[in-house]
């Protein structure tokens, strides 16, 4: 299994499955930050130490099989082309920080559900991604990988402070739990302006689709815990579960109210966006995200028939700059990307509608 396996398809295997509450919660993620004992943190270590960490993981963990998960493949960042790294970021398999790391690496599971990032901000960052609202299952998988790694390496751990990490906000459990949520009705009714500060007061943080510093395009928000010290992993996940459940309820209520009070306006918005996606000859990524959000809402409310949310999940990744260029076989100028993006969207929508016997002659 090679790098090509991970960059050839827009959708990871786990993304093709429908999880609980998947019309609102797109994915659940658990990330565990760990460091090796007696090795300086990545912010301070030498090139030799960085390479030693990668070599250790290649010898002990690459090509190894884990029960119920499968084999892992090691990908070294310095051996990976910039375009391929960008695709891995767009698929959420690695972080933007890791992509920029000269001595970074990543152990990826065959189904792309689990990635173990090496020499990012910490020596080890275990990430588990599950479809829908499945934080408990993601935590269980992350702990399984954590135990597997700890059988063969010693972690930097303090009885007083817990797991030691480069960033003080990760000290303690080292856990970052997050959900990716599609909240168009709360955004359209401007309730997110009130909700975000309330979430922050609970010790949680709201970010965009690619985490810290990213914008919430396409009405997709990432909700995660902020502090990891003084709480157990279970308490942190329970807190996020509680807030997520409330957001699901509020989004459902807002969708219902919006459809009841502004049915024609909402249908117009949904079909107008479908019309743009079906007929555009050039389209930027931000407009694509906005239109995909509208169409997803239309599918979830039963306004649009003959399209599945899976095709939208695929288009979300497929129309990103990195994957577009990977799909096209090389680098593209911005206007060339906009033309290619429009062509791919039209092609995929026509294919999906035809497959479901709902051919739209305008596409």
Swiss-Prot record:
It comes from the Bacteria. Residues 24-254 form the Phosphagen kinase C-terminal domain. It is an enzyme of class 2 (transferase). A motif (RDXXRA motif of the pArg binding pocket involved in allosteric regulation) lies at residues 337-342. Gene3D superfamilies: Glutamine synthetase/guanido kinase, catalytic domain. Its EC number is 2.7.14.1. Disulfide bonds: none annotated. One of its GO terms (cellular component) is extracellular space. The keyword Transmembrane does not apply. It catalyses: L-arginyl-[protein] + ATP = N(omega)-phospho-L-arginyl-[protein] + ADP + H(+). ATP binds at residues 27-31, 92, 125, 176-180, 207-212. The keyword Kinase applies. Transmembrane segments: none annotated. Appears to be allosterically activated by the binding of pArg-containing polypeptides to the pArg-binding pocket localized in the C-terminal domain of McsB. GO terms for biological process: phosphocreatine biosynthetic process. Keywords: Allosteric enzyme, ATP-binding, Kinase, Nucleotide-binding, Transferase. GO terms for molecular function: ATP binding; creatine kinase activity; protein kinase activity. It holds the Pfam family ATP-gua_Ptrans. Belongs to the ATP:guanido phosphotransferase family. Catalyzes the specific phosphorylation of arginine residues in a large number of proteins. Is part of the bacterial stress response system. Protein arginine phosphorylation has a physiologically important role and is involved in the regulation of many critical cellular processes, such as protein homeostasis, motility, competence, and stringent and stress responses, by regulating gene expression and protein activity. PANTHER family: ARGININE KINASE 1-RELATED, ARGININE OR CREATINE KINASE. This is Protein-arginine kinase. It comes from Bacillus pumilus (strain SAFR-032).
């Amino acid at each position: 299994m090679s790098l090509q396996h991970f960059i050839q398809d827009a959708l990871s295997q786990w993304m093709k499955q429908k999880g609980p509450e998947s019309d609102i919660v797109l994915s659940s993620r658990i990330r565990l930050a760990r460091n090796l004992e007696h090795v300086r943190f990545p912010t301070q270590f030498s090139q030799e130490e960085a390479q030693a960490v990668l070599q250790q993981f290649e010898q002990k963990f690459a090509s190894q099989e884990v029960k119920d998960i499968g084999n892992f493949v090691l990908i070294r960042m310095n051996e990976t082309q910039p375009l391929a790294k960008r695709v891995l970021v767009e698929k959420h398999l690695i972080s933007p920080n890791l992509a920029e790391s000269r001595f970074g690496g990543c152990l990826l599971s065959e189904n792309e559900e689990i990635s173990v990032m090496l020499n990012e901000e910490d020596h080890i960052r275990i990430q588990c991604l599950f479809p829908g609202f499945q934080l408990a299952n993601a935590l269980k998988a992350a702990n399984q990988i954590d135990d597997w790694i700890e059988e063969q390496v010693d972690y930097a751990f303090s009885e007083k402070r817990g797991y030691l990490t480069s960033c003080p906000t990760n000290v303690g459990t080292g856990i970052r739990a997050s959900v990716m949520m599609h909240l168009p009705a709360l955004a359209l009714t401007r309730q997110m302006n009130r909700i975000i500060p309330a979430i922050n007061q609970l010790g949680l943080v709201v970010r965009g689709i690619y985490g810290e510093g990213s914008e919430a395009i396409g009405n997709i928000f990432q909700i995660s815990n902020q502090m990891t010290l003084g709480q157990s992993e279970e308490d942190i996940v329970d807190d996020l579960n509680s807030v997520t459940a409330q957001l699901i309820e509020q989004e459902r209520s807002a969708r219902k109210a919006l459809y009841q009070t502004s049915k024609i306006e909402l249908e117009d918005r949904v079909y107008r966006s479908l019309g743009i996606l079906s007929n555009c000859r050039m389209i930027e990524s931000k407009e694509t995200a906005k239109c995909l959000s509208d169409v997803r809402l239309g599918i979830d409310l039963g306004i649009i028939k003959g399209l599945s949310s899976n095709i939208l999940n695929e288009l979300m990744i497929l129309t990103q700059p990195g994957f577009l260029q990977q799909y096209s076989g090389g680098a593209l100028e911005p206007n060339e990307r906009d033309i290619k993006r429009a062509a791919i969207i039209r092609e995929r929508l026509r294919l999906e509608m035809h497959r479901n016997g709902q051919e739209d002659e305008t596409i």
